[in-house]
Amino acid sequence: VGCEECPMHCKGKKALPTCDYGCECND
């Protein structure tokens, strides 16, 4: 469990539990 909302550059996608500084998104 981490963040559910991604930063602006990932907006509209799902964030991985490593959403801290650079969030990685999966489609």
From Swiss-Prot:
InterPro entries, per the entry: Scorpion_toxin-like_sf, Toxin_alpha-KTx_8/9
Superkingdom of origin organism = Eukaryota
Q: Which cysteines are joined by disulfide bonds?
A: C3-C19, C6-C23, C10-C25
Keyword list, A-Z? Disulfide bond, Ion channel impairing toxin, Potassium channel impairing toxin, Secreted, Toxin, Voltage-gated potassium channel impairing toxin
The UniProt GO MF terms for this protein read: ion channel inhibitor activity; potassium channel regulator activity; toxin activity
Localization? Secreted
Q: Which Pfam families match?
A: Toxin_6
Kindly state the tissue distribution recorded for this protein: Expressed by the venom gland.
Briefly, what is this protein's role?
Answer: May play a role in blocking voltage-gated potassium channels Kv1.2/KCNA2, Kv1.3/KCNA3 and Kv1.6/KCNA6 to a lesser extent.
The family this protein is said to belong to: Belongs to the short scorpion toxin superfamily. Potassium channel inhibitor family. Alpha-KTx 09 subfamily.
Q: What else is known?
A: Negative results: has no effect on rat Kv1.1/KCNA1, Kv1.4/KCNA4 and Kv1.5/KCNA5 voltage-gated potassium channels.
Domain comment text?
A: Has the structural arrangement of an alpha-helix connected to a beta-sheet by disulfide bonds (CSalpha/beta).
Return the protein name.
Potassium channel toxin alpha-KTx 9.11
